[in-house]
Amino acid sequence: MNAKHRVTSHCDHELGICGISPEANEALPAKKPLEIYTFIDPLCAQCWSMEPILKKLKVEYGHYFRIRVLLAGKLNVWNACEAGKAKYTRPPVWVKGVSSSNMPYAGDIKLSDFHPYKASLAIKAAELQGPKAGHRFLRKLRETLFLQKQNITNEDVLKACANAAGLDVDAFIADLHSPSAAKALQCDVQTTNEMDVDTVPTFVFFNDNSEEAGIKISGQYPFSIYVQLLEDMLGFVPVKATPPTLEGLLQTYGFLATAEVAMVLDLSSEEAEKKLKTLMLQQKVEAVPYEYGTFWKWLM
């Protein structure tokens, strides 16, 4: 979208993106041509650290793609766990990787009592209520793990996450123990193996209008790399949505880290924090500090 077409910031809750005015919607594709397979592990610190980049990609170019979340677990390990009864054996140092990103977290997390199968199964159960419900649940799940240091493989904690994400909690619990969620998770693992995904996070970009193979990228790269991948898959330079205002962004997402605000709005961390503190003085947001960073809760 060039400068002469800029309009007042708008957030489309159906599209799940900001910066698209009703007038500008006419210039956007009616059907999203791309799909991004996002291979993650809900206990993975590096996956959590990707949130600012993914948020910016959705806000600016979300009208071109859908995101499909796949759980890249180890099926042979889960089978040996008898459907999640065995405990997690990765050392706590695995979670210390969050400190290398700007995403806040509450300190080192002991994973020895975690059951990884249960957390992944819960995400598939949430997705049975729709993709948006699944995305909301995944976000709450990560916040509960990395910010509150709770055991997200505990069923009571999972119920609380489902409630906070606006899910039908009774249906969620029923689905958690149903063959449907287990089958969906098995499909994720099968896809993970078929695509030779051996590390998380990994992203595979597909064009629904092309028979060509997708493009796979593992790990974290500068934002410009992901935009270039979108351009390569689309075959043209994608139109960037009008950037949202700070208040519009917070109103849409409700609870954001300083790093997410800074990334989406192209601000330094210091600039973002200054603007957020101004809103705090106006009693529009509440600062929620953690040991390694701050989140901001929209109050209006």
UniProtKB/Swiss-Prot annotation:
Superkingdom of this protein's organism: Bacteria
Keyword Cytoplasm part of the UniProt annotation: yes
Coiled coil: none
UniProt-annotated location(s): Cytoplasm
InterPro entries reported in the protein's UniProt record: Adapter_SpxH (IPR046404), Thioredoxin-like_sf (IPR036249)
Keywords, comma-separated and alphabetical: Cytoplasm
Family: Belongs to the SpxH family.
Name of the protein described by the UniProt record: ClpXP adapter protein SpxH
Taxonomic source organism: Shouchella clausii (strain KSM-K16)
Gene: spxH
